[in-house]
Amino acid sequence: MIQQETILQVADNSGVKKVMCVKVLGGSKKRYATLGDEIIVAVKEAQPAYGLRDGQGKKVHNKAVQRAVVVRTKKEVRRPDGTYIRFDDNAVAIIDDKGNPKGTRIFGPVARELRDKKYMKIISLAPEVL
């Protein structure tokens, strides 16, 4: 369960290391984000002089605001078959406005729930889908 002010790891090679959730997308009353949900994040830690570029062609720096999709959560998620899935960390992948990942690699496993939410590009880049 991800909510405002939650600090998350970034699971791609976009150059961003840590982000903070600013807003959970999906309606005014939506408080928590889970696997496959889109959130708005603020960059808290980025590799210096490296990483994604914003619309003006400048390097992304701390405090930059980006869109991201949740790929791993510590809180367990119940699947329709009755099993539960949980991970060791809370992680996101940075995406653009069309839902495509900005990085070219995904580190660590991602949840199968991303397939249901139509994030097939992230699924194909991930080394393991659980």
From Swiss-Prot:
Span of the signal peptide: none
One GO MF term attached to the UniProt entry: large ribosomal subunit rRNA binding
GO cellular component: cytosolic large ribosomal subunit
UniProt-listed InterPro entries: Ribosomal_uL14, Ribosomal_uL14_bac-type, Ribosomal_uL14_sf
A single GO BP: translation
Record's keyword terms, sorted: Ribonucleoprotein, Ribosomal protein, RNA-binding, rRNA-binding
PANTHER family registered for this protein in UniProt: 50S/60S RIBOSOMAL PROTEIN L14/L23, LARGE RIBOSOMAL SUBUNIT PROTEIN UL14M
Subunit-level organization: Part of the 50S ribosomal subunit. Forms a cluster with proteins L3 and L19. In the 70S ribosome, L14 and L19 interact and together make contacts with the 16S rRNA in bridges B5 and B8.
Family, similarity comment: Belongs to the universal ribosomal protein uL14 family.
Name this protein carries in UniProt: Large ribosomal subunit protein uL14
Annotated organism of origin: Leptospira biflexa serovar Patoc (strain Patoc 1 / ATCC 23582 / Paris)
